[in-house]
Structure formats: structure tokens, C-alpha cells
Amino acid sequence: MAAPAPAGAAASPSPKPQLPSPFAELVKTPSGLEKVVLRGARNCCAEIYLYGGQVTSWKNDNGEELLFLSSKAIFKPPKAIRGGIPICLPQFGTHGNLEQHGFARNRFWSIDNDPPPLPVNPAIKAFVDLILRPAEEDLKIWPHSFEFRLRVALGPSGDLSLTSRIRNTNTDGRPFSYTFAYHTYFFVSDISEVRVEGLETMDYLDNLKAKERFTEQGDAIVFESEVDKVYLAAPSKIAIIDHEKKKTFVVTKEGLPDAVVWNPWDKKAKAMQDFGDAEYKNMLCVEPAAVEKPITLKPGEEWRGRIALSAVPSSYCSGQLDPLKVLHG
């Protein structure tokens, strides 16, 4: 196994990191944590904290926030930030022996000034590359050496993409396995007026019923109570329709076979110290993931998983998406 990173290497970002994009700015927040602000075309923007490598804000050209961030979110390590897009690695949820959702979301990442080449759209100007390597404390609980490179980018039309590359850097010949998720919190106007399309007839594991396996009905998913499901072999595109705002989020995923859908509803919301009692009404998590079948990498192998998020106006006729063919086109 590779030698652990020097003490403190993963505990704080570089003193004066250089940002490769003139459309990215490193800002120190009132909490003392640093974040990168990406500014795209037509006033679109996104914010990414170095703590957790976590996107916490994504705004469209009207300045409208598209991601949910709890008003009670705690910006103090080692607490994870409630909202945005936490990264779950090397374990999703309780699917393993590590802490809930693994440790990547509550470690300090560094700006990656020399990432390996990544095919990109030349029209994308606003982006940042981050990197996470294990510190000694991580190797004690998960004894594997790895490099996790993350690119967050704003497209010319305001879409947001996250590309993860995870490489096994063990030097002792050992493979490792992990589960993963982009724990994406979408901001919605009213959860009772939201429906999700693209997961009809899919098999899922119900985390509220001891991970028992069921098959979804043929209708779009609507929300009337707590939901915590892992949809298996989910399609590459999923649509989240917010009727009240006449807006559709389109989630496109690559390298991530599953999709988690979660809303804690009222009782669990009240039990969380970093979540407002009624905030469940304004959020929905739809999380591209690899949960049922862990990803295994041999030394030197690299995995890539990507999501692209967009928000488009939606019109509805007889409960179907208009001819934009969001799910298929």
C-alpha cells in the first residue's frame, strides 16, 4: 500500500492554490471555510466548498437557487454540510461498516492544479478541479490508498456537471471496493406538487423496510410520506417535475447504475438538528449512485462517474412531458 499522506495533508487546502479558470474565484466564508465560486454565462453561478468537495449552490441566469441548502446547515467540521451535493464515498448510507455515507464529505479537499487530461466541451469556461487523497486517519478505518479527482463545471447554458475519477493507488497489489453517490438535494416549491419520471417499473430496495426489494408501479413517483428508496439499474436520464414552478430538472448520469430517492418527511425532519422542521416540503434528493453492486478497482485502475444537471421550463399535457422528449431525446 502506498505511504499515507503526510500528517495534515488532507486536513487543509494548499496555502495559495491557483485556479485554472478565470471564471473561478476562491473565497473565504464567514465560517472560516473556503469555497470556489464559478461564474458562467448569463449570470449562472455555482459554489463549491473545499470542505467535502461539496457543491452548495447552483443558480440559474435569474439568480434562482436550484439546490436545497438547509437554513440550519452546520459549517463546522467534522459535521457534514446539510444540502447541496454531498459526495458519499467509500460507502453510501449504511451499506457497509463505515460511518454513514463514508468520510469524503467531511474531509478537506485540495485544488488540483495538474489534473490528468479530461475530455471537455471547449465552450465550458467555468470549472474547478479538486483532489482528495487519504490521510492517516482514513487509512486506519479504510486501509486503501486512492486518488479522487473531481471536476465541477458550469456549461454555457447554465447546466451543472460533476465528473469523478477514482484511482486505486495501492502498491501492495490489493484491489478495493466501494459504494458511491452524488447525494443531490434539489430545491422544490412544494414536495406534494412534485413528480419524478423515468423510474417507473424499476426494481428498488426500500431502506424503510430493511432494504427489501420491490418493483415500482407504472405511474410517475409522487410524494405523500417519507421515501428512502434505491432504484436499481435506473435509466441514464431522470426528470423531476415541479408543477408549481413549471420547471423540470433533468438528471443525466454516467457510470452510476442506481438512483436513490429520499425525502425525510415531517417526523425525521424534526429529529435532525441541522434541518428545519418544515424544510422537507422544499427539498427532494435524487441521487445518482452505485449502491447494490460495489465498484471494484485493481491497483492502477480508474473509475469515472459523471452527472449533468439542467433545469428547463416544463409544460404538462395529460400528465406527460411535452414533446421535448426529456427522458429520451
UniProtKB/Swiss-Prot annotation:
What GO MF annotations does this protein's record show?
carbohydrate binding; glucose-6-phosphate 1-epimerase activity
What segment(s) does the record annotate as region Disordered? 1-20
Recorded catalytic activity of this chain's protein: alpha-D-glucose 6-phosphate = beta-D-glucose 6-phosphate
The cross-references to Gene3D superfamilies, in alphabetical order and at most eight, read: 2.70.98.10
Q: Where is the active site?
A: H183, E287
Sequence positions that bind substrate:
R82, Q100, R105, D228
Give its E.C. classification number: 5.1.3.15
GO terms in the biological process aspect are: carbohydrate metabolic process
Record keywords, A-Z: Isomerase
Q: Which residues form the signal peptide?
A: none
Q: Give the family from UniProt.
A: Belongs to the glucose-6-phosphate 1-epimerase family.
What is this protein identified as?
Answer: Putative glucose-6-phosphate 1-epimerase
| Organism this protein belongs to | Cenchrus ciliaris (Buffelgrass)
